[in-house]
Design a protein with these regions (language model features):
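Acidic, metal-coordinating helix/loop segments flanking the phosphotransfer/catalytic sites
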Residues: 34-52
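Short amphipathic alpha-helix used as the core "switch/output" element in two-component signaling
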Residues: 43, 65-77, 93, 97
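Recognition helix of helix-turn-helix DNA-binding domains
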Residues: 159-192
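Active-site residues of response regulator receiver
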Residues: 56, 83
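Basic, Lys/Arg-enriched C-terminal extension of HTH/homeodomain DNA-binding domains
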Residues: 182-213
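C-terminal output helix
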Residues: 87-89, 103, 107-117, 162, ...
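Acidic catalytic/metal-coordinating carboxylates
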Residues: 36-37, 63-66
């Protein structure tokens, strides 16, 4: 099963379901770890790999939908729900809160595997984005206070003389700071620096835009 280098977590209180899913995934070359409760899953040291969480609705310690809500702002893998008692309100709630799919038992292998592939791909992309954000944040932390003042002015589109006037420094000094910002942020162009600023959510006020009153 592609992509490689991923792991599937299974949380279901039915031992037979856990065993059958682990066997299926193992036969396809996927790593899988199964748990009988959410508590067991949370106590597991998850490896740093793209992942998918196959989650039952009715669990001994918490309802799967409630658990989904609890972890909505945390870095847990995308969820594929499986349940023997599915209903439309539950499926709508699950999908609305980001579940990849909501499968009612018995479900087809094809549907499950398609959902797992989608979840792993989504998690891989999210991990890459988090890594890129961590990198640009580290670069931003290397800027001096003055360079941090210059950064939003540069990406706002102000001319050097306009930015220099706003900061009360010479145009030559502004150009030096601008060059340092470009180098430290490893921006190949102004457009590249703008994209970095967007990732960092660098604020740009109306007064900083070219032609603003």
């Amino acid at each position: 099963m592609n992509p490689q280098g991923h792991i599937v977590f299974i949380v279901d209180d039915d031992a037979r379901i856990r065993e059958s899913l682990c066997d299926l995934l193992a036969s396809l070359g996927s790593s899988a770890v199964a748990f009988g409760s959410v508590g067991e899953y949370l106590s597991y040291a998850r490896p740093d790999l793209p992942a998918c969480l196959i989650l039952d609705i009715e669990l001994p310690d918490i309802n799967g939908l409630d658990f989904q809500k609890q972890i909505s702002d945390q870095d847990h893998p995308p969820i594929v729900f499986i349940t023997g008692h599915g209903d439309i309100p539950s499926s709508v709630r699950a999908i609305k809160h980001g579940a990849i799919d909501f499968l009612t038992k018995p479900f087809s292998e094809a549907d499950l595997l398609a959902a797992i592939r989608a979840a792993v791909a989504l998690d891989g992309k999210a991990r890459q984005e988090r890594a890129e954000l961590a990198t640009v944040r580290q670069r931003f932390s290397s800027l001096t206070p003055r360079e941090r003042d210059v950064f939003p002015l540069v990406v706002s589109g102000l001319l050097n003389k306009q930015a220099a006037a706003e900061l009360g420094i010479s145009e030559v000094t502004l150009q030096i700071h601008r060059r340092n910002v470009m180098q430290k942020m490893e921006a190949a162009s102004l457009a590249d620096l703008v994209r970095i600023a967007e990732k960092l959510q660098i604020p740009i006020t109306r007064s900083r835009r070219t032609g603003a009153p």
